[in-house]
Amino acid sequence: MRVILAQPRGFCAGVVRAIEIVERALQQNGAPVYVRHEIVHNRHVVENLRNKGARFVEELDEVPHGAVAIFSAHGVAQTVEQDAQARGLDVLDATCPLVTKVHVQGRQYVAAGRRLILIGHAGHPEVEGTIGQIPAEVILVQSEAEVDTLTLPADTPVAYVTQTTLSVDDTRGIIEALQRRFTDIVGPDTRDICYATQNRQAAVRELSEQVDVLLVVGATNSSNSNRLREIGTESGVPSYLVADGSEVRAEWFANARTVGLTAGASAPEEMVEDVIAALRALGPLEVATMSGREEKVEFKLPAKLTQAVAREV
């Protein structure tokens, strides 16, 4: 059997930054440090950080007064920021800069007098954080069908922003539906969706043309990983989401000669290697990597951490 690895795959710059923030906070402050919500949606990453001394909580009332508290890469509402300040917490914000960019865009549109529409999935931490960062009502739209249910007059000045981990194709369809529905509408281009989301989805579309089965390494609660699996399925390829090699099933490959393998933006490369090992246990295996876009994006760490490093030097 032949395995073709997607390129790019796995960790994005926002995830790398978030994990490094937790690790540096532990190095500088000692354990424990407290992280609100999973730092990224991957249990292997979370367990690794937990073993190093990070404690994961859902609400700040679980954090002792004055302790180090880290916001996850998905972002938080302004009320959470205010709560942290009131509790005297030493806050490190690991919100992905591309998510913060969405917050800034949304506030700018509202300040310009437009009603704001957020394209995203209800209940996702990024969506909840974005809604909580906008000082006005935000209308959440999850599908093209929901556009038809909007009651705003067609000439209402509106703007849209999007969750960063959505399907590029689905998002484009919703934007086009909004543009048909409203006569005065502005918003970022679909190219403004996270670079890593676009690159991984494009790689999977290309990969799906070459394989009999697609495996996506990622967590079930990872939005971007689920979108990769969906793209494979929509391309007509049996596609499976696995957390690691233990979830690989031999029957998936009964008639397969070529398997595509990718990973969501929060999935570590060690889990990709674990899946390859599981496939190798099924029989002879040839592994190749597709040609693809090389990513060189890096995001700066919070000044609080870099200043501490400078003092140590």
From Swiss-Prot:
Record's keyword annotation contains Oxidoreductase: yes
Top-level EC class: oxidoreductase
A biological-process GO annotation: isopentenyl diphosphate biosynthetic process, methylerythritol 4-phosphate pathway
Binding, dimethylallyl diphosphate: 41, 74, 124, 222-224, 266
Positions of the catalytic residues: 126
Sequence positions that bind (2E)-4-hydroxy-3-methylbut-2-enyl diphosphate: 41, 74, 124, 164, 222-224, 266
Pathway: Isoprenoid biosynthesis; dimethylallyl diphosphate biosynthesis; dimethylallyl diphosphate from (2E)-4-hydroxy-3-methylbutenyl diphosphate: step 1/1; Isoprenoid biosynthesis; isopentenyl diphosphate biosynthesis via DXP pathway; isopentenyl diphosphate from 1-deoxy-D-xylulose 5-phosphate: step 6/6
Top-rank taxon, per record: Bacteria
Keywords: 4Fe-4S, Iron, Iron-sulfur, Isoprene biosynthesis, Metal-binding, Oxidoreductase
Cofactor binding: number and manner: Binds 1 [4Fe-4S] cluster per subunit.
Binding site residues for [4Fe-4S] cluster: 12, 96, 194
Enzyme Commission numbers on file: 1.17.7.4
Cofactor names: [4Fe-4S] cluster
Residues that hold isopentenyl diphosphate according to the record: 41, 74, 124, 222-224, 266
Catalytic activity: isopentenyl diphosphate + 2 oxidized [2Fe-2S]-[ferredoxin] + H2O = (2E)-4-hydroxy-3-methylbut-2-enyl diphosphate + 2 reduced [2Fe-2S]-[ferredoxin] + 2 H(+); dimethylallyl diphosphate + 2 oxidized [2Fe-2S]-[ferredoxin] + H2O = (2E)-4-hydroxy-3-methylbut-2-enyl diphosphate + 2 reduced [2Fe-2S]-[ferredoxin] + 2 H(+)
CDD domains assigned to the protein according to its UniProt record, in alphabetical order: lytB_ispH (cd13944)
Coiled coil: none
GO molecular function term, any single one: 4 iron, 4 sulfur cluster binding
Gene3D superfamilies: 3.40.50.11270, 4-hydroxy-3-methylbut-2-enyl diphosphate reductase, catalytic domain (3.40.1010.20)
Protein function: Catalyzes the conversion of 1-hydroxy-2-methyl-2-(E)-butenyl 4-diphosphate (HMBPP) into a mixture of isopentenyl diphosphate (IPP) and dimethylallyl diphosphate (DMAPP). Acts in the terminal step of the DOXP/MEP pathway for isoprenoid precursor biosynthesis.
Family stated for the protein in its record: Belongs to the IspH family.
Protein name: 4-hydroxy-3-methylbut-2-enyl diphosphate reductase 2
Gene: ispH2
